[in-house]
């Protein structure tokens, strides 16, 4: 069998990775009352492999930070609830990072949310978002401290490190992107000012747990929750350079969305949706060049072939898989064997059932021995 680039081992800092297939941080809406539940023990342990990296679902840093039914890590009870989940991953030899976040104006809680602005997310068919309160400059250190404490709590829960969530339209990105940030103080205006908050969070978290335990997720080209930027190339490269300078373990970047290509032939218009790698090859290349000291991860619509190509070409050190890993708990094995994949069921992504669409996806051999020790 030909070598599979995704299975080239690598070392970075204190960690040795047996393969380069990373579980994406996936919100699953099954942490009732913002508390990790026993069924998460099975879910994460199913996807753990020796020397494989897993990133937890986004985990709130304070009582106003999460969405409904997503976990937190600001209380002792939450820390204790995470411990058996982390232990189950470690029992399989996995490496486990906790993604920490604050949703900002994308909140679904009843309390008034905070943001870089006082403009709400535009109403959509699923949700009418509340009007946020513009975070005062003097309040920002408190939020930074919440991230710092959450990082310490994650390490106390046994996690190997933390990933700061700076992507997908949540609080830190609401500051970074000029499509949302309309401030006129030291946290708004210039690119450097808009990125100040996120970098101060990185500095505080790195000081608390060490930069070699810290990663950052960024999505310059994605406009979730109305969060867009006029120059995503500049934003991505600037943040990658600053993260590299700080010596964090990794930068995890999300590829641009698929785009519709329109062609006109003999007066007839044809619209075709093409892969982002066909339309904009190596769009993250500038970020990759700017971030060289640590691991550069890419994610967003990758499959086995594209992942192997990304690693083999040096475009990425590791590849983050979301929906494929969700539906295939043994995804590394399937990729190694080039075996068929389960199809994911989108309708169960965010339901609250502790089994259906969560821990009931079959293994390649339907071998549930890996599950039997962690039935909760």
From Swiss-Prot:
GO biological process: fatty acid biosynthetic process; oxylipin biosynthetic process
EC nos: 1.3.1.-
Xref: InterPro entries: Aldolase_TIM (IPR013785), OxRdtase_FMN_N (IPR001155), Oye-like (IPR045247)
Keywords for this protein: Fatty acid biosynthesis, Fatty acid metabolism, Flavoprotein, FMN, Lipid biosynthesis, Lipid metabolism, NADP, Oxidoreductase, Oxylipin biosynthesis
Cofactor(s), by name: FMN
Binding site for substrate: 165-168
Pfam families: Oxidored_FMN (PF00724)
Example of a GO MF term: FMN binding
Positions with a binding annotation for FMN: 25-27, 58, 99, 217, 301, 322-323
Main function: Putative oxophytodienoate reductase that may be involved in the biosynthesis or metabolism of oxylipin signaling molecules.
PANTHER family: 12-OXOPHYTODIENOATE REDUCTASE 13-RELATED (PTHR22893:SF113), NADH OXIDOREDUCTASE-RELATED (PTHR22893)
Family: Belongs to the NADH:flavin oxidoreductase/NADH oxidase family.
Protein name: Putative 12-oxophytodienoate reductase 13
């Amino acid at each position: 069998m030909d070598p599979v680039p995704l299975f080239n081992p690598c070392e970075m800092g204190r960690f040795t990775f047996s393969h380069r297939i990373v579980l994406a941080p996936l919100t699953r809406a099954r942490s009732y009352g913002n508390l990790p539940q026993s069924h998460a023990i099975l879910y994460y342990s199913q996807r753990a492999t020796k020397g494989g990296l897993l990133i937890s679902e986004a985990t709130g840093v304070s009582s106003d930070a999460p969405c409904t039914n997503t976990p937190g890590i600001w209380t002792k009870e939450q820390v204790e609830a995470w411990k058996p989940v982390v232990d189950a991953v470690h029992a399989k030899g996995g490496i486990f990072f906790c993604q920490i976040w604050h949703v900002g104006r994308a909140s679904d809680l009843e309390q008034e949310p905070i943001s870089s602005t006082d403009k709400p997310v535009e109403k959509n068919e699923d949700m009418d978002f509340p009007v946020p309160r513009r975070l005062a400059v003097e309040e920002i250190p408190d939020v930074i401290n919440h991230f710092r404490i959450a990082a310490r709590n994650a390490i106390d829960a046994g996690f190997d490190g933390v990933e700061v969530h700076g992507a997908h339209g949540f609080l830190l990105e609401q500051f970074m992107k000029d499509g949302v940030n309309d401030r006129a103080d030291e946290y708004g205006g210039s690119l450097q000012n808009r990125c100040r908050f996120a970098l101060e969070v990185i500095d505080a978290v790195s000081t608390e747990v060490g930069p070699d335990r810290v990663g950052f997720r960024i999505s310059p080209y994605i406009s979730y929750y109305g969060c867009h930027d006029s120059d995503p190339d500049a934003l991505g490269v600037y943040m990658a350079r600053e993260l590299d300078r700080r010596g964090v373990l990794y930068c995890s970047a999300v590829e641009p969305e698929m785009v519709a290509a329109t062609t006109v032939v003999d007066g007839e218009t044809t619209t075709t949706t093409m892969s982002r790698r066909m339309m904009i090859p190596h769009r993250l290349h500038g970020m990759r060049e700017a971030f060289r000291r640590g691991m550069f991860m890419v994610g967003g619509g990758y499959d086995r072939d594209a992942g192997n190509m990304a690693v083999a070409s040096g475009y990425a050190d590791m590849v983050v898989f979301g929906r494929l890993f969700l539906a295939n708990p043994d995804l590394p094995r399937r990729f190694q064997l080039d075996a068929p994949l389960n199809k994911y069921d989108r309708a169960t992504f965010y339901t609250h059932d502790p089994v259906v669409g969560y821990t009931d996806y079959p293994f390649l051999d339907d071998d549930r021995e890996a599950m039997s020790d962690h039935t909760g």
